[in-house]
Amino acid sequence: MFIISGRTMLKKAQQEGYAVPAFNIHNLETLQVVVETAAELRSPLIVAGTPGTFSYAGVGNIVAIAAELAKSWNHPLAVHLDHHEKLADIKMKVAAGVRSVMIDGSHFPFADNIALVKSVVDYCHRYDVSVEAELGRLGGQEDDLIVDGKDALYTHPEQAREFVEKTGIDSLAIAIGTAHGLYTAEPKLDFERLTEIRQRVDVPLVLHGASGLPTRDITRAISLGICKVNVATELKIAFSGALKNYLTQHAEASDPRHYMIPAKAAMKEVVRKVIADCGCEGKL
């Protein structure tokens, strides 16, 4: 099997002190870039998609293409549901072959978040599907969900301990100062809070909103317990920017096989950098 659960790769990362990158993809070309680059660098890989991505491309198509690419490169990977909110939707995608899930109930009150997450864990663990959940809220935009900065909430360390114990999740996404989208100013990550969470929680910790973070912040976060790093916006900007530039310079261009090449090359450089920042080259 080339489509695997994220549980084992995150535990290995936790034990060996690096992080696994989770790259958000949208179509054939972006899938090709992340799988090919990870395979060339022998890096563990999580291919992530939001509900919007799976609606756009089709869950069966994403799983099938990811499986074929993984097989052709002899490179097992996890296909991951990013920021999913409904158990019925998760059940459908697990049935289609997904083996890694993030259930996001962070917008609910604490007790309701626990109840929702536990229902997903109880279902997914029957099928060896790993489950990530979020406690605290990141600012910014993910799919059609927009969280204003004033509504962003940092993860409370003691609540994190209770949350993990009561839900049985495999990994915990925490809020320590990152945000979805690009930063207008350099973010100030709360590393002290991260340390306090790590002291209370033994599951792998996840950092969302890593696009544009300085390498030093990613490296320090990993040294303090982050085991999975999510990148989305930075990939889209590199891909679309190179595509726009090519079409501006070649107004007559009409062949996707030509104008997708520079877009993929630009995105590949971001993937390579993130893998280097995560310290996971050669860790497959």
Curated annotation (Swiss-Prot):
Chain positions recorded as dihydroxyacetone phosphate binding sites: G181, G209, A210, S211, N230, V231, A232, T233
Enzyme Commission number(s) of this protein: 4.1.2.40
Cofactor: Zn(2+)
Catalysed reactions listed for this entry: D-tagatofuranose 1,6-bisphosphate = D-glyceraldehyde 3-phosphate + dihydroxyacetone phosphate
Keywords associated with the record: Galactitol metabolism, Lyase, Metal-binding, Zinc
Pfam families noted in UniProt: F_bP_aldolase
Subunit description: Forms a complex with GatZ.
Designated name of the protein: D-tagatose-1,6-bisphosphate aldolase subunit GatY
Organism: Salmonella heidelberg (strain SL476)
